[in-house]
Amino acid sequence: MSDLDDRAGLDHVVDHWLSLDEAAERLGVTPSRVRQLSREHQLVVLRPPGGRGLAVPAELILDGQVVKGLGGTLTVLSDRGLSDVESLEWLFTADSSLPGRPIDALRENRGREVRRRAQVIV
């Protein structure tokens, strides 16, 4: 499956995307800093399905900051072999063991619980 095919599934889990400029504005940084945060696995930046430019799922930003615990969670998911697309699918898909979506648990400051779930992904 191509990366484009992989991204098509994100339409069903990510409701709202921010352009790079919008994400930068919400974070109070430059677009190049947003790209750097992505390279550092602190944030996910990619081309959304049907999108023309790079974008960030809006729910990864809360109160002008990257959601607390997101970076550590993305690192764990990457270490388990998940791509950025797969990581977003996991974050935005309900998990009955939490309960709810991992992104919601992170937004509720339950990062440790989310990372424990991420560590057992095979």
State where each predicted segment sits:
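Non-transmembrane "mature" sequence context
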Residues: 1-122
